[in-house]
């Protein structure tokens, strides 16, 4: 019996994720207030921050707090949005930006405590979008393209349409139930959504970045699927390459 309990405990720890800090209940992680931008790169990230309408599954939650403690996520059991309809402490969206092939890429990512329920359950899920603009230092910067990067190296490339922008020219995304695979996906929508407090990768305290970088967000019951934080150093540029929506380096 003791060995059975130890094995179950070890398996649970593997699924929940490991890091050098502390794992916390998903609804107790304290989000960061959105900092006041101090440069044009941060201003652009705030300017283009999308709205998110959730029609399926979990709402976004903070993944890490200031001391580096990270969300333990949720088991993929019960209703698809069970215990994850929004944190009373507030939500969060994360971003990281850089030049890529002569265009400025702003990657936004939302953390969901679970991705899907049932036999193929996912604990931890990241939904990611990349917005491409011409130059963040320009007051009249132009939106050039959008990629909905689904975390498993698949990319959706859809032309930007007016109905997918709000009155302030902010993009509107929907987190919906994907066909053939009951898990959250991002798509463009005409529905009004909500925005979350944004914090960029560079604005995060060092302990928080370390927590997100070292935690292994294992999602499957046997720890075989790892949901990596898309903004961390060894993943970010690979994701930009996956998300590149233009036919060559100089397409506008």
Swiss-Prot record:
A motif (Hepta-peptide GHRHDWE motif) lies at residues 121-127. The keyword Secreted applies. Keywords: Glycoprotein, Secreted, Signal, Virulence. Residues 1-17 form the signal peptide. Its main location: secreted. Glycans are attached at residues 20, 67, 166. It is found in: Secreted. It comes from the Eukaryota. Pfam families: NPP1. GO terms for cellular component: extracellular region. Belongs to the Necrosis inducing protein (NPP1) family. Secreted effector that contributes strongly to virulence during infection by P.capsici. Key residues/motif important for the effector activities are degenerated in most NLPs, including the nlp24 peptide consisting of the conserved region I (11-aa immunogenic part) and conserved region II (the heptapeptide GHRHDWE motif) that is important for phytotoxic activity. This is NLP effector protein Pc118356.
């Amino acid at each position: 019996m003791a060995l059975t309990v130890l094995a179950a405990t070890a398996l649970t720890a593997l699924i929940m994720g490991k890091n050098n800090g502390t794992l916390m209940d998903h609804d107790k992680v304290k989000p960061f207030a959105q900092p006041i931008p101090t440069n044009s790169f941060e201003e652009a990230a705030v300017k283009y921050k999308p709205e998110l309408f959730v029609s399926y599954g979990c709402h976004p939650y903070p993944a890490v707090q200031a001391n580096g403690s990270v969300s333990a996520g949720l088991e993929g059991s019960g209703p698809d949005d069970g215990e994850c309809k929004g944190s009373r402490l507030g939500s969060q969206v994360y971003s990281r930006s850089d030049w890529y092939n002569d265009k400025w890429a702003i990657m936004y990512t939302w953390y969901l405590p679970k991705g899907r329920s049932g036999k193929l359950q996912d604990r931890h899920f990241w939904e990611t979008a990349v917005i491409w603009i011409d130059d963040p230092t320009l007051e009249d910067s132009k939106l050039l393209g959008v990629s909905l990067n689904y975390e498993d190296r698949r990319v959706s490339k859809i032309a930007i349409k007016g109905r997918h922008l709000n009155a302030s020219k902010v993009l509107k995304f929907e987190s919906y139930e994907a066909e053939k695979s009951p898990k959250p996906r991002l798509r463009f929508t005409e529905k009004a959504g909500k925005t979350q407090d944004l914090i960029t990768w560079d604005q995060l305290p060092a302990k928080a970045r370390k927590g997100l970088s070292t935690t292994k967000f294992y999602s499957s019951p046997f720890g075989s699927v790892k949901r990596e934080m898309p903004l961390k150093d060894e993943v970010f540029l690979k994701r930009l390459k996956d998300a590149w929506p233009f036919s060559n380096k100089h397409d506008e």
